[in-house]
UniProtKB/Swiss-Prot annotation:
Cell location: Secreted
Source species, domain of life: Eukaryota
Disulfide bonds: none
The protein's name in its UniProt record: Mytimycin
First and last residue of the signal peptide: none
Task performed by this protein: Has antifungal activity against N.crassa and F.culmorum.
Length: 33
């Protein structure tokens, strides 16, 4: 899960169905976990 440490700072993808969907508020797309 990309929303969990230590990966959350590296998640940038907002595309549903992908391994990196739904990320932290730190990413450039503004996604949230």
């Amino acid at each position: 899960d990309c929303c969990r440490k230590p990966f959350r700072k590296h998640c940038w993808d907002c595309t549903a169905g992908t391994p990196y969907y739904g990320y932290s508020t730190r990413n450039i797309f503004g996604c949230t976990c």
